[in-house]
Regions:
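Conserved GNAT acetyl-CoA-binding A-motif
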Residues: 118-128
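Conserved beta-strand-loop-alpha-helix junction that forms the acyl-donor binding cleft
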Residues: 126-136, 153-156
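Conserved GNAT-fold acetyl-CoA-binding loop/helix
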Residues: 23-45
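Conserved active-site alpha-helix within GNAT-family acetyltransferase domains
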Residues: 107, 119, 131-149
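Conserved beta-strand in the GNAT
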Residues: 58, 65-73, 90, 95
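A short beta-loop-alpha structural element at the N-terminal edge
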Residues: 2-16, 25
Length: 156
């Protein structure tokens, strides 16, 4: 398995995987997520692929077939009155094809993101995970992540 930057040719597979992630969210919180949709359009993906601020890494097999991805966002705080200056690599989305889960592809992607964050001089790697996605929460805890802050809600 090779981890590389995503390219335009990967967009169809990224779209397919985005549908998989969205389905998990829509099934868990149909009051928030629209059924049968995805997070990004092809046009939005094309823009993200061109930006150094939003690196997308893909795990590909020996046939260059995209088995998973990690969408990232480089963030930097500088000169804030209350927060320390710091660089962050935020994982916006991490997905492994549901047919290939359990093969450590997610771990490879996560470790690649960590290595890139270190190379970029980041203080930490952050992400959000929906409480409905317990397998993802367990995976991230196994990777050594711990809660930074918690968003709470009261449905009215």
């Amino acid at each position: 398995m090779l981890i590389r930057r995503a390219e335009e040719k990967d967009i169809p597979r990224l779209i397919a995987l985005l549908y998989q992630v969205h389905r998990v969210h829509a099934n868990g919180r149909p009051d928030i997520f629209r059924t049968g949709n995805k997070k990004y359009t092809e046009e939005e993906l094309s823009v993200l692929l061109k930006s150094e601020q939003t690196p997308i890494y893909v795990a590909v097999d020996e046939n260059d077939y995209v088995c998973g991805y990690a969408f990232c966002v480089y963030q930097e705080i500088c000169g804030d009155i209350s927060l320390m200056d710091m660089k962050t690599l935020y994982i916006d989305d991490l997905c492994v094809d549901e047919a290939m889960r359990g093969c450590h592809i997610g771990t490879l992607l996560y470790e690649h993101v960590l290595a890139q964050a270190k190379r970029m001089g980041c203080y930490h790697v952050t992400l959000n995970v929906w409480c409905l996605n317990e397998p993802a929460m367990r995976f991230y805890e196994k990777c050594g992540l711990s809660p930074l802050k918690i968003t709470m809600e009261k449905i009215l």
